[in-house]
UniProtKB/Swiss-Prot annotation:
Residues given in the record as Mg(2+) binding sites: D131, E161
Native organism: Danio rerio
Protein name as catalogued: Tyrosyl-DNA phosphodiesterase 2
Site (Interaction with 5' end of substrate DNA) location in chain: Y187, W306, F324, H360
Cofactor(s) for this UniProt protein: Mg(2+); Mn(2+)
Co-factor binding details: Binds 1 magnesium or manganese ion per subunit.
Disulfides per UniProt: none
GO biological processes: convergent extension involved in gastrulation; determination of left/right symmetry; double-strand break repair; gastrulation; negative regulation of transforming growth factor beta receptor signaling pathway
Length: 369
């Protein structure tokens, strides 16, 4: 095969991986767009993604009553997360009730302290690649995400692989959150801030100049309990053969973490697609920056966020278990240190549709501030 043929074959493989399509579809869109990856992906998304939630809305109108009956009949038969409209959420409340934050007066008296005060001082986050590019059961899976938001009521949510229709769905339901995105074309990242807990100051988008997959770095400046925070998320270049580009993007991320003001806490969370050797190749994390999973003792139960052995959303002929999704923390130099408190994987329950919320597990993490 010629060098040109090999190059185009690699482009087709990358397009198919990112878009969730096959090589024939990839070749068609790439050829129509002069083998420009970004143009081809944009063309694909415009053609395929916009109608996903519209179709689901029509389906819901017809089958809404029946689905309530079916859900009732199915309850207790299998371990599944309930996502019907009644149970899913009302995220409109500023202080939703959930098992994590509710404490009875009796328990508070028994313990001698008001636990809610302790909980209020903790910062909670969720980071999740929601696989918006997979349109199968996408509305069901978006409702699943909303159920987890209602359960955990995180202060900050970092999301990757969003599409415009998914964002509009979330904005209609998660009205207690401020939402901003890394783009409005194709697929992109986003950050959600709980309005009653986090004050937004400003945001910026840092482009990765040589990305072939529309990737960038989204940064938000906020305050939490009077403390300045820099929140960052990204979806670094995918695929094993994109290690060089992914490493370049990691260098940009780490440089931006180092450049943040000394009086600010920095939290980066996202789908890095990183292998440990790639982190080592850039000299490891800078002084003062920690990998939260490592800081918490490298707990095995929350190591693999991409796990085709346990997660059946993607049909692949091999087992792949990787720690693609990572959280980096840098404390402020001129303020009391922030320490990781707890980390867990979420999204490990199947939804009523028989699939998981995403092909990635989400990460729920809390910090002592």
């Amino acid at each position: 095969m010629s060098a040109l043929g090999e190059s185009r074959t690699r482009l087709c493989d990358q397009f198919a991986f990112v878009s969730g399509s096959d090589s024939a579809v990839a070749q068609c869109y790439l050829a129509e767009n002069e083998w420009d990856m970004e143009r081809a992906l944009n063309s694909f998304f415009e053609a395929h993604m916009d109608s996903v939630f519209d179709e689901e809305a029509e389906k819901t109108e017809v089958t809404g009553n029946k689905r309530k009956d079916d859900t009732a009949e199915a309850s207790g038969t299998k371990k599944k997360l309930k996502t019907d409209n009644a149970d899913c959420i009302d995220l409109t409340a500023e202080e939703p009730t959930c098992s994590i934050t509710v404490n009875s007066k009796e328990n508070q008296a028994e313990n001698g302290t008001a636990k809610s005060e302790v909980e209020d001082s903790k910062l909670s986050i969720i980071s999740w690649n929601v696989d918006g590019l997979d349109t199968l059961n996408l509305a069901d899976r978006a409702r699943g995400l909303c159920s987890y938001l209602a359960l955990y009521t995180p202060d900050v949510v970092f999301l990757q692989e969003l599409i415009p229709a998914y964002v509009q769905y979330l904005k209609k339901r998660a009205v207690s959150y401020l939402f901003f995105e890394g783009s409005d074309d194709g697929y992109f990242t986003g950050i959600m801030l709980r309005k009653s807990r986090v004050k937004f100051l400003e945001s910026e988008i840092i482009c990765f100049p040589t990305t072939q997959m529309m990737r960038n770095l989204l940064i938000a400046q906020v305050t939490f309990s009077g403390q300045k925070l820099y929140l960052m998320t990204s979806h670094l270049e995918s695929c094993k053969n994109q290690s060089q580009e992914r490493t370049k993007q990691l260098r940009v991320v780490l440089q931006k973490i180092k450049e943040a003001p000394e009086d600010a806490i920095v939290i980066f969370a996202g789908d890095t697609n990183l292998r440990d050797a790639e982190v080592a190749n850039v000299g490891g994390l800078p002084a003062g920056v920690c990998d939260v999973w490592e800081q918490l003792g490298k707990q095995e139960h929350c190591r693999y966020t991409w796990d085709t052995k346990a997660n059946s959303n993607k049909t692949v002929p091999y087992v792949s278990r990787c720690r693609f999704d990572r959280i980096f923390l840098r404390s402020a130099k001129t303020a009391p240190p922030v320490t990781p408190d707890h980390m867990a994987l979420i999204g490990m329950e199947k939804l009523d549709c028989g699939r998981y919320t995403s092909d990635h597990w989400g990460i729920y993490c809390t910090f002592n501030t």
